[in-house]
Amino acid sequence: MDTGGGPCLVYLARAANDPDLVRAFAENLRRLPAGTDYELVLAMKGFSVVEAERQLRDLADVNPAGIIFADEGLDLGVYFGVAAQLQRERYCFLNSYGAPLVEGWLEKLDAALKLPGVGMVGATGSWASIPSWLAYSRHLPSAYRGLLPEPRVARQLRLAIELEHAGTDKRAAADALRTRLRALRELPDQITHLQRFPAHHLRTNAFMITHDLLQRLRLHVVHSKTDAYLLESGRNSLTRQVQRLGLATVVVDRAGAVYDHEYWDRSQTLWQGDQEGLLVADNQTLAYERGGAERRRFLSAYAWGQRANPSLPSKHPS
């Protein structure tokens, strides 16, 4: 196993995405020094060999290596594939929308991972619960009762965010909705494997973990959105497995401060305040940033329950 220098920085590049996403990520690397040495690897999902070679040439100044994956499965499965091939000492995984916001961002994550007793670190975490949401949306007893808007309005707010993420491409929007609906149909069969609120989980948009620890976890194949839900926020999620090993799962803010799972809400990184503590942004944090008061209240309560504390813009579309 390679144990040299800094972490292996793995960025998920999808051929199906807007190419500006990869360009924006590379520009962030140029503009915001990571604060530590790193090995950059593009996990190139759905690229042909010719397309991959062209992309790597275009980004030659940031010195990336590339590994091509078929356009199937979801992000976590690709990350596990990279780790299996490279076997580096530690990794920082970023999804396609990952956008570092401050200088020294990678050094802050890496320093947190090296703290005694820490097993996994992330730029954001959440307590949001899919089972509690499903119960609430069906007018059943739920921890969200009295905290979220009435179910019809809450469902409309979620749908608006999904459509926003899909963009103006109607086909992409339809595909996104079909994937979401299929996952929701499958979830009742998996409900016992998911956690009710508070379902502590580090979000996998930007996280770090060592290879040795990754090998100790039970990692199933990620074929569907349901598989991804289970690994990110289920009873046997990455976060829960790490915690059961007696290791901390922490969120790191832009100042480098570290928060254990009981205090993630104080980090001001995800759907809280103005997200002023956020170290690495993504499309979900952007949905909150651009949202009006109604959306911000909904997202903050969904993630943090009674500890929700959104900053509400005076005038902004919801």
Q: Where are the regions a protein language model picked out?
A:
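Short beta-strand-to-loop acidic/aromatic patch adjacent to the donor-nucleotide binding site
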Residues: 89-99
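Conserved donor-nucleotide/metal-binding helix-loop-beta segment in metal-dependent transferases, i.e.
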Residues: 101-141
